[in-house]
Regions:
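Glycan-recognition surfaces
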Residues: 151-157, 170-171, 220-329
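Aromatic-lined carbohydrate-recognition surfaces of secreted/lumenal glycan-active proteins
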Residues: 120-134, 201, 216-232
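C-terminal beta-strand-rich structural cap/linker in extracellular carbohydrate-active enzymes
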Residues: 419-441
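Aromatic-lined carbohydrate-binding/catalytic grooves of carbohydrate-active enzymes
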Residues: 61-113, 117-193, 198
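Secretory targeting and sorting signals
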Residues: 1-26
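N-terminal module-boundary/linker segments of secreted carbohydrate-active enzymes
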Residues: 24-55, 60-63, 221
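Carbohydrate-binding surface patches
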Residues: 312, 318-321, 326-328, 362-402
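Structural recognition of the beta-strand scaffold that forms the well-ordered cores
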Residues: 35-41, 70-77, 120-125, 187, ...
Length: 441
């Protein structure tokens, strides 16, 4: 494992370097120098996470070899909490209570289990304070203040499922201390990654408070924001967090189960819409903070809702955008073709290079993206985003950033194409991609 990760680090160093990126981006908490890699529960597990299910995915992440390629986060999303008719049930200090019917050993034990596998543990929360905390007027840990002292009951936060979260008035004494107590609890449980969901422009004070609180714990906790964040606040998200979701959910919610759960997990329209947002947000990404395109739905073959070509294109776009690579599939039933995709260290190296690519061609279904390596080479991705008919996609080397000829290597196959003069052309099937490294001559 160490040798492979060391090789990836060398590859990333080769790609990123002087002239390859701007100054360090995002939070200066020293975390997420490269985009996070791992697995998240929402796409596949959805509303029914349990201790056993999360452990099974952690086991698979480790035993499949994905961990050896850098996929190390096991992230528990929503529905770890217990709800009643008034919203979230709370502990004695007004924080969400764990649903012990799902997690009988508690969250710390689950985090310890992940850590024992050489993995990291991620967790989930939303802004605000629970209605039940205000109704009970629970004390704020370590202070003389109570929930009613800090709640703005005239406004409710966006909480997608349990609901009934009031805004916090951060001008009130005790507000920061409440968030501090929650962050301290998460740190004591061994949380390594925290996703705060339902964030919008009105939640900047919450993001500031959580950033401050997480730092104060003394534990390194990767701080992720979700979802569909307004780009108008891009500089703020960049300053405070380690990643931010640039669009709504990748899931199509078109499965046969309740609330659209089950397979398929996504569809091509939900993936192809990411090309536009990746281009719009490109300038905000860099070491310390990344544009999050959402879960990578690779691992379960075609049943996830994408063809093999579309899955390769999805991975290619995520890698070119330097997005976090958080798998949303069932790793206990890992498809062989998909495993080969996910363990392609050339693709992972492109994602982990610290550079978000820019789009240089966008014409109908034809897209071309490029990024420059520290040694003067370029990584170039060509796409046919259409759903019918082949497309001949071309790019001039002058559009990529140089002139003359180049030695070309296909990064998906590893095969050297040879010398190509002036431009590069590929005929691509619907949803297909070509990812190359070009070494100017």
């Amino acid at each position: 494992m160490r040798s492979r990760l060391a090789a990836l680090a060398v590859a990333a160093t080769t790609l990123a370097g002087p002239g390859a990126t701007s100054a360090a981006h995002a939070s200066d908490n020293g975390l997420s120098v490269r985009p996070a890699m791992g697995w998240s529960s929402w796409s596949f597990v959805r509303r029914w996470p349990t201790e056993a299910k999360i452990k099974a995915q952690a086991d698979a992440l480790a035993s499949s070899g994905l961990k050896d390629h850098g996929f190390v986060y096991v992230n528990l999303d929503d529905f770890w909490q217990k709800c009643d008719s008034n919203g979230f049930t709370v502990d004695s200090y007004g924080r969400w209570a764990v649903d012990t019917s799902k997690f009988p050993s508690g969250i710390k034990a689950l985090a310890d289990y992940a850590h024992g596998k050489g993995l990291k543990f991620g967790f989930y929360v939303t802004p605000g304070i629970a209605k039940n905390a205000v109704t009970k007027n629970t004390p704020i840990e370590g202070t003389s203040y109570h929930a009613k002292d800090i709640a703005d009951t005239s406004k409710t936060e966006k909480n997608y499922n349990c609901k009934n979260m009031y805004y916090i008035d951060y001008s009130k004494a005790g507000a920061q201390e409440f968030v501090n107590s929650w962050a301290k609890q998460f740190a004591s449980w061994g949380v390594d990654y925290l996703k705060i969901d339902g964030v919008g422009s009105a939640d900047v004070p919450d993001v500031q408070a959580w950033d401050k609180a997480l730092r104060a714990t003394g534990r390194p906790i990767n701080f992720a924001l979700s979802n569909n964040l307004p780009i108008a606040n891009g500089a703020t998200w960049e300053r405070l967090a380690n990643s931010w979701r640039t669009q709504g959910d990748i899931e199509c919610y078109c499965g046969s189960g309740s609330n659209g759960s089950g397979y398929p997990l996504t569809d091509w329209s939900h993936v192809s819409s990411r090309f536009g947002s990746a281009a719009s947000w490109q300038s905000y990404a860099g070491p310390g903070g990344w544009n999050d395109l959402d879960s990578l739905e690779i691992g379960n073959g075609d049943q996830a809702g994408l063809t093999a070509d579309q899955r390769r294109s999805m991975f290619t776009l995520w890698a070119m955008a330097a997005s976090p690579l958080l798998l949303g599939t069932d790793l206990t039933h890992l498809d062989g073709t998909d495993k080969a995709m996910l363990t392609n260290d050339r693709l992972i190296g492109v994602d982990q290079d610290g550079v978000a690519a820019s789009r240089v061609v966008s014409s109908g279904s034809q897209q071309v993206w490029r990024k420059k390596e520290a040694n003067g080479d370029y990584v170039v991705a060509l796409f046919n985003t259409g759903t019918s008919g082949n497309a001949t996609v071309s790019v001039k080397w002058s559009q990529v950033g140089f002139s003359g000829g180049a030695d070309v290597t296909d990064l998906w196959s590893g095969k050297k194409t040879g010398t190509v003069a002036n431009s590069y052309t590929a005929t691509l099937r619907p949803g297909e991609t070509r990812l190359i490294r070009a070494h100017p001559l």
